[in-house]
Amino acid sequence: MSNKIISLGSIEIANDKPFVLFGGMNVLESRDLAMQIAETYAEVTQKLGIPYVFKASFDKANRSSVNSYRGPGMEEGLKIFEEIKSTFNLPLITDVHEVQQCAPVAEVVDVIQLPAFLARQTDLVVAMAKTGAIINVKKPQFLAPHEMRHIITKFNEAGNDEIMLCERGSSFGYNNLVVDMLGMDEMKQTGYPVIFDATHALQRPGGRSDSAGGRRAQATELARSGMALGLAGLFIEAHPDPDNAKCDGPCALPLHQLENYLTQMKAVDDLVKSFEPIDTSK
């Protein structure tokens, strides 16, 4: 098995390359907050030498409650993305939920994300594939790791082979997620880059009745465990005031902890990727 390398400008994304950070905020709350968070990430990752892609959503279409904040919408969101891209010279990743969003989003954003709940929607997969953008596929909480090959095949047959696979936890009874570390290794066997979404994996879906709960206090332990597998990337979300974030605050890393957190993740990644592989199947 060879590791596929995805090129994003000067960034190389592959399971045997130094990890790439996909990080930012859950949903765009305001232009000013997005700029503040992007600036912090840009400064920290440049200092630590970590390749970086800014992440935020313009619309959270799958909130638990109809009254929950969803975001500024695509038109306003893309304006904010353009400003972040030009100000900080950062590549961007965001998610789409509808076929008609794919083309306009791909004109601004470098990586388009297929949400976990929508990963089997063929029309959306085809529309995303046809943009030619790099695709980040969130593994649904209800699918086994080996079933991701079917989604890969859909993208391939629609003409797109620039695919990353993202683990964000598996359903474990009601209102709980667990991370299958061996499952991530199984996804690595496809050769495609595997990304670990360490913050969403901390969710307790529906754990606060009308919104998701989370286990922010375990963010470091979970991410270190995932990085020990030797992955292509880490996906995290941070907020300067997680307790008052408009979405997924219970999972968000406090922004002031970002440098310490990433210093540890880089140390784990560097160490693991310095080892010679051991084939214990023989």
Swiss-Prot record:
Location within or outside the cell: Cytoplasm
Catalytic activity: D-arabinose 5-phosphate + phosphoenolpyruvate + H2O = 3-deoxy-alpha-D-manno-2-octulosonate-8-phosphate + phosphate
Keywords: Cytoplasm, Lipopolysaccharide biosynthesis, Transferase
Pathway(s) served: Carbohydrate biosynthesis; 3-deoxy-D-manno-octulosonate biosynthesis; 3-deoxy-D-manno-octulosonate from D-ribulose 5-phosphate: step 2/3; Bacterial outer membrane biogenesis; lipopolysaccharide biosynthesis
Group of enzyme by EC: transferase
GO molecular function: 3-deoxy-8-phosphooctulonate synthase activity
Pfam families, alphabetized: DAHP_synth_1 (PF00793)
InterPro entries: Aldolase_TIM, DAHP1/KDSA, KDO8P_synthase
GO biological process entries: keto-3-deoxy-D-manno-octulosonic acid biosynthetic process
Tagged with keyword Cytoplasm: yes
GO CC, alphabetical: cytoplasm
EC number from the UniProt entry: 2.5.1.55
Domain of life: Bacteria
Annotated HAMAP family: KDO8P_synth
Family per record: Belongs to the KdsA family.
The protein, known as: 2-dehydro-3-deoxyphosphooctonate aldolase
Origin organism lineage: Bacteria, Pseudomonadati, Pseudomonadota, Gammaproteobacteria, Alteromonadales
